[in-house]
Amino acid sequence: MIVLITGASSGFGWEAAKLCVAKGHRVIGCARRTERLQALQKELGDAFFPLPFDIADADALNAAFERLPEDWRAIDVLVNNAGLALGQAPAHESRLADWEQMIATN
């Protein structure tokens, strides 16, 4: 089974990738932080394919999937874990750019 996990560079996504590989699945790990995905690949080996890109960028997403080898493209499970929270100000004091980025990502 091939599992695609967004937000795989830390937290729940990181742990989910480790668990899925331990259960015998192949995992595509997506996140913006290339170095964190590479560290996870070192830990998990060939059962993990790092696919760095910004999920809020449609062009980057399309380009990323073009980089996937053919035998990694039949995705069985999506763990849609990517997300972010910018600014902790009340809504009326928040920046519009922060809201736009959160909506695009989450």
UniProtKB/Swiss-Prot annotation:
Protein's UniProt name: Probable NADP-dependent dehydrogenase in aabA 3'region
EC number in record: 1.1.1.-
Family: Belongs to the short-chain dehydrogenases/reductases (SDR) family.
Lineage top rank: taxon: Bacteria
Pfam family, any one: adh_short
GO molecular function, one term: oxidoreductase activity
Species whose genome carries this gene: Dichelobacter nodosus
PANTHER family: ALCOHOL DEHYDROGENASE (PTHR42901:SF1)
InterPro entries: NAD(P)-bd_dom_sf (IPR036291), SDR_fam (IPR002347)
SUPFAM superfamilies in UniProt: NAD(P)-binding Rossmann-fold domains
Phylogenetic classification of the source organism: Bacteria, Pseudomonadati, Pseudomonadota, Gammaproteobacteria, Cardiobacteriales
Keywords annotated in UniProt: NADP, Oxidoreductase
Binding residues for NADP(+): 4-28
Keyword tRNA processing applies: no
